[in-house]
Amino acid sequence: MADVGWCSGAQATLMLANLMPGPAGEVGPLIAAEGPGLVVTDLSKTYPKSTKPLFTGLSFSMERQGRLALLGRNGQGKSTLIKILGGVLPPSDGTIDWRMSVSWPIGFGGGFQGSLTGIDNVQFLARLYNRPFRDLLDRVDDFAELGAALRQPVKHYSSGMRARLAFGLSLAIEFDSYLIDEVVAVGDARFQKKCEEELFGRRGDRALMMASHDTNLIGRHCDRALIIESGKAKMFDDIEEALDIYTWLRAV
């Protein structure tokens, strides 16, 4: 079982090494293996200052190359679940068994060291994943379109700039699966289209788990859905049925 680590602040970047099935340098496609790529068992989350669980007993699996939507009204725990699966937050209980490589939540910038420049953060990840720094930097620079801002400390970035940097890094390193939390809302329409083409076009053979309120986007790119409601979850193999139920829940 791949351990899922968690931490906060500057140390959060170290979570990336814990998400891989093998050493951090072995981040290549593993989709040829058999069986599910992710198995979650009895997962629960209760925040320290809350007496009521956000969700309890979540159990589900995701196939290699599967495309799973996370649906639910605001406050039901979709983003929290994405962060738990990505190692950003700890679960209160349960197990997470990743059997394929997985990205950190795309667009999540909380793992960057704020006092370092964008370039320095790219260099850190290049060392962590044993990737050529110049190649990684060129990919990030080309995709994120931050220009001279890459030479500035990340703490001076806007939330959108941090998201672009995180998105660029997520796509500069190849993973078997990608965690997505409304990431295509980053930037202007042109950049959003660029994000969609990278994730859903060029990486069409990869697994993804996506939390989004955009039912059209979900309908185009997901084949199953997990609906979270009142702390429980139900899996749907029919994406259209899931979207109908989700639309009804939002209208209640």
Describe the function of each predicted region:
Residues 101, 106-177, 182-189, 197:
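ABC-family P-loop ATPase nucleotide-binding domains
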Residues 192-204:
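Helical segment within the ABC ATPase nucleotide-binding domain
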Residues 232-252:
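Conserved beta-strand-loop-alpha-helix hinge in the C-terminal portion
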Residues 6, 19-40, 44-69, 92:
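A short, flexible loop at the N-terminus of ABC-type nucleotide-binding domains that lies
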